[in-house]
Structure formats: structure tokens, C-alpha cells
Amino acid sequence: MAAYRVLTAGRDHRMKGQAWVELVGALIVARVRGEPTEELLRETQDQVLFLVQDAGRGKVLYDTLEMEAPPVDVPWAQRALDEKLGPTKLRRAIVVPNSRLAYLARLTFGEGDYRVFYNDIVLAIKWLSEDGASA
């Protein structure tokens, strides 16, 4: 299986954050650094969905350990993107450094198939590796 890696830094200088999306074994890993914007989340979602379709994987690890908390409208933008997923099923583990980002992650992903982990990438990977609704 070929490895995929995408760096998304936005199309203009106003972008405050960066994201990397790559296929690592059976998982799609999305790393977000800095303060994300709605555009960055949209581009990251596009890359995640590309890999979901191309590699046939629906388990996604979001590493937000180096992310700064964005304004609350940014997580709502991600929720709107998720409402457009249609039949695509994702199982997501979100690794956060603090309670503020954990709260924003819960706002972002609502009632989806996800779990938030505090600073524990190993446990997040273990959870994703278990049999779940989305493979």
C-alpha cells in the first residue's frame, strides 16, 4: 500500500494553522498545529475523505496536541462539514492536550462515533484498532 502525506497550510497568508494528513498503516492520521480556521478544517476534511475513499479506511486519529483553541465558530464549521458526510462512516479518536480543546472536540463531533483522549496517542490508537462500527 502506498503512503500518502498531505500538508495543508491554506492558500493564503492569513492561515493561522497547519494540518498534515497521512495514511499510517490502517489509520488515517490528521495532525493540526496552531489555530485552525474554517478553511483549514475544510481542506483537512477533504484530504481525510480522499484517503477514506482511496484507501478504504474509516478510522481517523486527530492529533491536536499542538493545536491552539480557535473561536467557537470554527468547531461549528466542522460539525456542518460532518453533516454532509452522507453514507461515509468514520470512527475518530481525538487526542487533546487540555480540557478546553476536549470541550471544543465534543462540540465539533457531537454524537458521532468518536472518543476524546487526553495526551494519550497510544490509547487512542488502541481504541481505533478495536473492532468498531467503522473500519
PLM regions: where:
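Amphipathic, Lys/Arg-enriched alpha-helical "gate/interface" segment within cytosolic domains
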Residues: 2-135
